[in-house]
Amino acid sequence: MRQAFADAQAALPFVVAQGRNIETAIYEARYPEYSYRDLMPVVTEGNQWAIGTQFYSMQLAGEAKFLSGAANDMPFNNVSWGEGSHDYAMIGSGWEWNLEEVNQASLYGRNLNDLKAMSASRSTERLLYDIATTGSTEKNWRGFVNQSNVQTITAAATGTGSSTLFANKTPQQILIDLNGLLKLVPQSSNNVELADTLALPLEVMDYIATVFVGTEANSPTILERFRTSNVYTARTGRPLSITTADSLSRAGAGGGGRIVAYRKALDVIRFHLPMPRMVLPVHQKTIMGFETGIIARTGGVEVRLPGAMAYMDGVSEPA
């Protein structure tokens, strides 16, 4: 029979060894339901303990024109520089083991229960997802779905009873709305920007993925038709990326659905994550207990080119 541990100090080597197994499981865990990486580029570069990041932006201005051999009016190009900063903050979630749990695990030759650890891991990832999508009121951060400087329009009131809701529209009206949002980005940027990604509320994705354009047996769904008949694909020959975010179901005016069209690139939008999930070493808390936890550091979402994004509200009822 295994000898019982008399106190936490004696049990510490066993707990540390068990903690390494749990740490591996935490780092290997993936949470597809909290996939902020699918929505925007994630930046993990830089020192994980830095106060924040400082960045520089530039704007080029200039032109070329016809000149004579004796000209003295050569047009010169100019570069204007801007400077900004973004602060980081730390989040965390922990768990504990007591001497009773440790001795029982050792007695029966089993691993320490990792349920609390995996719950802490999920909680941390959930908070990162919430910060990435909706921001943080505590830190005065905005997220992917509620940037104040992104242009916002309302879906056309062309549905039944002048409704803007997609559920009250024909497939043709929905396709016009979706392409209208895609066209808004180049129109408002003098054709400099082009949205290559569309993020939809879950209920809108479900609707257009299951409603057919026509009544024929081989009729495509609205989603299938839109994938091949959208202005981005028509202009570039490349497929439009279409994704979802549950927070979009209540991000619009009045708590309704919101669609986001944007160019998914680092120079447009980024989620600062200098320290992804890090498991802390096991610490002996008392003579009968241990504690550890997970921390992460983030700076939230930063939109550097709001003109490369656009919102459309009124597409679905409040969730």
Walk through the language-model features, giving the residues of each.
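Sequence/fold signature of self-assembling virion shell proteins
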Residues: 1-39, 46-47, 210-319
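Short, flexible beta-strand-to-coil junctions
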Residues: 43-48, 56-61, 191-194, 199-213, ...
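Oligomerization/assembly interface segments of phage tail-like spikes and tubes
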Residues: 93-95, 292
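Alpha-helical scaffold segments that mediate packing/assembly in large oligomeric complexes
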Residues: 96-176
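Extended, solvent-exposed, turn-rich assembly/linker loops in the middle of proteins
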Residues: 145-221
